[in-house]
Amino acid sequence: MPRAVHSGIAENIMNTMKHIRYRNWGPLALAMLLTLAGPLYSPPADAHGERAQQASLRMRTLHWIDTEIQPRKVAVNETVRVTGRFMPSQFWPEHMRSIEETAFLNIGVPGPAFVRIDSRVNGVPMIRSTRFHLAKTYEYEVVLKARAPGRYHIHPVISVEGTGPIIGPAFWVEVTGDQKDFKHTITTMTGEVINPETYAMTSILWWNALWFVIGIAWLAWWFRKLPVIMPRYIKVEEMGDDANKLITIPDVIVSVFFFGFVMVVIAGGFFWANYQYPITSVLQTGKVEVEPLPQPPQLVEVEVNKATYRIPGRSFQVEMTVTNRSARPVQVGEFTAANIRFINDKMFDIKPQDAQDLVASSGLRVENPPIQPGETRTITIYADDALWETYRLTSLINEPDGRFAALLMFFDDQGTRYMNEIGGPMIPSFG
């Protein structure tokens, strides 16, 4: 674009700004006031956006099993244990980075309300990242120490590189006491006992203050005189090849001084840190290997024939062929999809433990009798509950890859559990 055109555009902008009447600033001022005041009236967030995650992401990535968080009420300095199992789905979406590449066990909690004391998967410390194999089962444990009083919704989380956090089921934990009483010390490799809450705080404040002053001084030098911002841009366009004259000899001298001073500060900080902390350990970036739990023999085999979701009734229907190779009769007791547990109330009386516990106590309808040992039978189950709509799983019918994945749990008359992952295309029904 010709330089004259640039200059004309800039002049038009400036002329427009000059001719704005004071009465026109009223709506703008009101909008700015509402924007600034909004956070003061925003209600607190109760959870971590589980409903906002894509339905296929929740259904076809991780199956969380037997998640438990205990105790649910602790005081500051007391510990909370998050335990359970998870299984990466064999139907993992192909367009997403796989959990078999890089993953990390984490905890989802609002703010630094807890300190993680220990985390393990199958007994292996999870200080670093790892990888998890599809269709394999892993057992995890995370120990947290309460730091700040409040009521918190705690989730186990697996963070997958390139995919993001995959959130597990959650429970509310209440922390009582006073944060001033919180104590957390660690012993370094040299035997020094430190408090991470305040360690090297003086140095941190001084360094931040120094760089802040340097930045303000640099900006003040260039803003000390006109023109700046838009007027300066117009001036550069007007002067053309002579625009370099806007930068004076004192400007060059001050710039060289700032550059030299910053280099001296960086070098001085480097040598000071080496003197102050002569023994250091490099942050480790390698992965640890975690072997999956031994897989039990597949005594109950399942083949999905057809899966439909009836939109008017919020009913998910799966027709499947089941072969029972165990020694006892089995029956479907639970269907778990996207952290929602649909329970066969004829077998179990399981109630939600709190308002956000995703349990449909009578959401699983199984009309067939138990499947006998050695029998192969085609059965149909119905997972009916408003949670399909409440947690936006119905959006699956609008996705280009309308496939589902879930855990189906059979139980025999002695309470032995047999888990099967099922999945495949889901067909919406509007009738």
Question: What do these predicted ranges mean?
Answer:
Residues 172-208:
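Short, aromatic-rich amphipathic segments at membrane interfaces
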Residues 245-276:
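Internal/C-terminal transmembrane anchor helices
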Residues 273-431:
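C-terminal soluble domains/tails of integral membrane proteins
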Residues 51-80, 295-304:
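N-terminal edge beta-strand
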Residues 62-64, 110-127, 349-365:
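Short beta-strand and strand-turn-strand segments in soluble, beta-rich domains
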Residues 214-256:
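Juxtamembrane interface at the cytosolic side of transmembrane helices
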